[in-house]
A protein has these predicted regions:
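Flexible, low-hydrophobicity surface segments
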Residues: 1-146, 167, 243, 253
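Beta-strand segments within the central parallel beta-sheet cores of soluble alpha/beta enzyme folds
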Residues: 65-66, 222-228, 255-257
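Short, surface-exposed connector motifs at secondary-structure boundaries
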Residues: 33, 96-97, 190-197, 230-231, ...
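Helix-loop-helix module between adjacent transmembrane segments
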Residues: 154-155, 194-196, 202, 230-238
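Short acidic, glycine/serine/threonine-rich loops at helix termini
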Residues: 73-78, 116-119, 201, 209-211, ...
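Conserved beta-alpha junction segments in alpha/beta enzyme cores
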Residues: 157-216
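Phosphate/pyrophosphate-binding loops at sites that engage ATP/ADP/AMP, CoA/4′-phosphopantetheine
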Residues: 53, 209-225
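Thiamine diphosphate
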Residues: 233-254
């Protein structure tokens, strides 16, 4: 760190002038735009879809639901996370959480895809979701995965409290906060024969390649992940999110990139 001397970021000028090319900026001929449809319940099953209104809009390419989605050979995502619970998108009718991807609308323009996605309706068999942490913490199961110790104990807390002259017992809460980078999450997937190129805003492109290869049963040598710029990450671009495998899945279900 220098004092009174400017420090130039390697990518700073490109980002502040708009010259930086992010993942969603890469254009491919005949590209289709995908927008997910999200669940409105926290737990249960999907009974049925009503796609009629969405299908009436001009520019529709395809609507992917669990009934017509590409069957994935693997539900694991990464070898180091083999013991973690896996949720394979669009592979069954189960709903595990509110906001889960339950369908994908593809259209010739982004605006059309967004509008069509808003018209897709789903009916559910809703189950009771366990959302109260305090009442269920006693039955929590320690995670087995991740390669790190999940439970720590250090020192004698109760002993320290008993010896303290003053003890403050209070509950503090903070509002929900979200990292909001200049580059939103988006992925462009381009199939050329059996080779895949992903334009991906990622802080860990090797992880993305390994996950996609594992999930889809593709040799890693056939996958190229490109992320020349990352428009802010804050850790949110250090993992694999749903839009990436959905973009990879989509071209296998239709003939457009």
């Amino acid at each position: 760190m220098s004092v009174s001397q400017p420090r130039w970021r390697f990518d700073g000028i490109a980002k502040v002038t708009g010259a930086a090319q992010y993942g969603a900026d890469f254009s491919i001929e005949r590209i289709a735009y995908g927008v997910p449809v999200l669940s409105k319940i926290a737990k249960g099953r999907i009974r049925s879809f009503d796609l009629r209104a969405a299908r009436e809009i001009s520019g529709l390419v395809e609507i992917i639901t669990p009934s017509n989605a590409l069957r994935l050979p693997n539900r694991g995502v990464h070898p180091e996370m083999k013991d973690a619970p896996q949720i394979a998108m669009l592979q069954d009718d189960l709903v595990h959480y509110n906001g889960q991807v339950i369908a994908l609308v593809l259209a010739e323009t982004l605006e059309a895809a967004q509008y069509m996605a808003s018209l897709v309706k789903a009916e559910y068999h809703a189950d009771t979701a366990e959302c109260d942490f305090e009442s269920k913490v006693s039955s929590a199961v320690p995670p087995k995965d991740g390669g790190n110790t999940s439970q720590y104990r250090r020192g004698d807390i109760e002993g320290a409290f008993s010896r303290s002259e003053v003890r403050v017992d209070e509950i503090y809460a903070t509002p929900v906060q979200h990292h909001n980078p200049m580059e939103p999450h988006a992925t462009v997937a381009h199939w050329q024969g059996d080779r895949l190129t992903l334009y991906e805003p990622s802080q860990w492109i090797v992880f993305v390649r390994t996950c996609i290869a594992t999930w889809f049963g593709i040799p890693e040598a056939n996958i190229r992940v490109l992320g020349p710029y990352v428009g802010g990450g804050f850790g949110g671009k250090g993992a694999l999110w749903s839009h990436s495998p959905l973009a990879v899945m989509r071209p296998k279900c239709s003939d457009a990139p």
